Each structure stands twice: as structure tokens, then as C-alpha cells.
């Protein structure tokens, strides 16, 4: 899950930090990961 979300990045509960390019959003968030609008997958 997302612990903190700002305009330029996301901090996930497991400690992962992900910088988000301008205009990229989280489009799907599940217990095991997230899919970003640029097609990237983040697993946690």
C-alpha cells in the first residue's frame, strides 16, 4: 500500500521509493503491487 504520495514520487509501506515522471499516476493498487500509468509495475 502507499504510505505517502507526493507530486514527484511515492513511498510504499515496504520502504520502496519510486520517483514518478510528470503525469504518471498509480492506476491499480493491490496488496502485492501497483501498476503505474506508464506501464511500470511495482511489487511489494
Curated annotation (Swiss-Prot):
Q: Which windows of the sequence hold sequence repeats?
A: 3-20, 27-44
Signal peptide (from-to)? none
Tissue/organ expression: Calcified shell.
State the UniProt keywords alphabetically: Cuticle, Repeat
Q: Which Pfam families match?
A: Cuticle_1
Which stretches are transmembrane? none
Coiled-coil regions, chain positions: none
Q: Which GO terms describe its molecular function?
A: structural constituent of cuticle
> Out of the domains of life, which is the source?
Eukaryota
* Name of the protein in question: Cuticle protein CP459
Q: What is the lineage of its organism?
A: Eukaryota, Metazoa, Ecdysozoa, Arthropoda, Crustacea
